[in-house]
Amino acid sequence: MGKKDKRWVLQRKNDHYYNLAKKRNYRSRATYKLFQLNEKFNLIKERNVVVDLGCAPGGWLQAARDIVGDKGFIVGIDLQTVKPLPYENVIAIKGDMTKEEILKQARDLLPEKPDVIICDASPNISGVWDVDHARSLELTTMALMTATKMLKKGGNFVVKVFQGDLFEKYVQLVSEYFDKAFTTKPRASRDESAEVYVIGKRFNGRKFDMNSKSPIVKLLDTNPKENEITSPSLRKDISKEDSGLMIKRIKEMRSKKE
């Protein structure tokens, strides 16, 4: 075992939330992030209907189930297969959240439009800061777009975003669809992490505007034949061309800001 591996193992042993999650049979330390976000912003209530985008390995599904109880309902969507949880009111679908057929599956399972949409998904990390920032924005913008398609009016939204020079533009975009937009970093987030959570309270019912002047929307690629969004962030085989295009877009937006 190398020095980095030993350091990682030691860090996990000393990680309060990792140990707490393991002790209480939660699948991820991130479970406590949702608990803390909900405590602060009152996003999810008992009996609510919730959709979890990018739900693997299931930590946020567990947290949401603890909050809504046995009278609520939760559907998760992820590209990976998620091991089923022992609750009749928690179902995970394997698929791409940007595909209409997957959203239809989710809608068919739900008893009504969701009260809350949550997303703790992370893009595939390249190690190149501009690319990872762009991928994060792309993924979180698609989560926002999905929320505007599914949420009931007055519903809530929470999504993880990596900080970067276009972060505030994303917050502004969220505020176009919700009465209030907030940013926060829960105690369970590691200090060294670049993650921040964006909260949208009370969905105003607007449809997502693909013609928006927001620079964030320009990170998305529309497939004109299928009228769907194509997402390099959701593919493990992301190409050098995709990465280069993202860097180019980020640099163009940065130069416009200046």
Curated annotation (Swiss-Prot):
Keyword rRNA processing recorded: yes
Keywords carried by this UniProt record: Cytoplasm, Methyltransferase, rRNA processing, S-adenosyl-L-methionine, Transferase
Annotated catalytic residues: 160 (proton acceptor)
Key word Methyltransferase present: yes
EC main group: transferase
Places the protein is found: Cytoplasm
Gene Ontology molecular function: rRNA (uridine-2'-O-)-methyltransferase activity
Record-linked Pfam families: FtsJ
Known function: Specifically methylates the uridine in position 2552 of 23S rRNA at the 2'-O position of the ribose in the fully assembled 50S ribosomal subunit.
UniProt xrefs under PANTHER family: PRE-RRNA 2'-O-RIBOSE RNA METHYLTRANSFERASE FTSJ3, RIBOSOMAL RNA METHYLTRANSFERASE
Family: Belongs to the class I-like SAM-binding methyltransferase superfamily. RNA methyltransferase RlmE family.
Name of this chain's protein: Ribosomal RNA large subunit methyltransferase E
Encoding gene (name): rlmE
